[in-house]
Amino acid sequence: MNKEIKVAKEAALEAGNLILSFYKADYEIRDKGYHNPVTTADHASDNRIKEILVQSFPEYGWLSEETVDSKNRLSNERVWVVDPLDGTKEFIEGVPHFVVSIALVENGIPIIGVLYNPVTAELFEASEGNGAKLNNKNITCSSEQNLSSMIILNSRSETKKGLWDPHIKTFKELKPIGSVAYKLGPVSYTHLTLPTIG
């Protein structure tokens, strides 16, 4: 799996650099459906990731949020699962809470995960049996059990609606983050405790 994690990181970094070239610049925005925008940055990132991963591993399947699904992937033991720009709304708003998200799934079980935030230069990686890393340094999850000491990564939209107001004093801190994938990376830090996905 060393080659897979290396190539996945390379793809995430290259896609992240592409995304940065669009960030706070001019790009096209389309609506895929209910509150689900897509930009030219999403598509450019998707194309680059696919080019790198499929060229390196042509025998693996491909599933991406921005690519038309092919049922052929179901016959593959290993499948790349990609969101080329998770947190598109945040990207559009200029909020640096978005990531490139790449996973490798084997027979339905995730065995590799890579997240890259190109604005903060945070590169998260995890692979089966090897733990998690942030920018090549080992990281571990918090063992905190006291609610008043926990930092909670919660939904930006739920925060705007006031849904977290009753819990403000329950936790040490509430940190609103829009991207679901981006919430999953920082929980690997010892000082961040729990993502909420709503």
Language-model-derived ranges and their functions:
Residues 1-85, 166:
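N-terminal subdomain of lithium-sensitive/metallo-dependent phosphomonoesterases centered on the IMPase/IPPase/PAP
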Residues 68-69, 86-89, 120, 196:
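Short, glycine/acidic-enriched loop or turn micro-motifs at the edges of active sites
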Residues 76, 171-172, 192:
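Short, well-ordered alpha-helix to beta-strand connector turns
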Residues 191-198:
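Single conserved hydrophobic/aromatic residue that forms the stacking wall/gate
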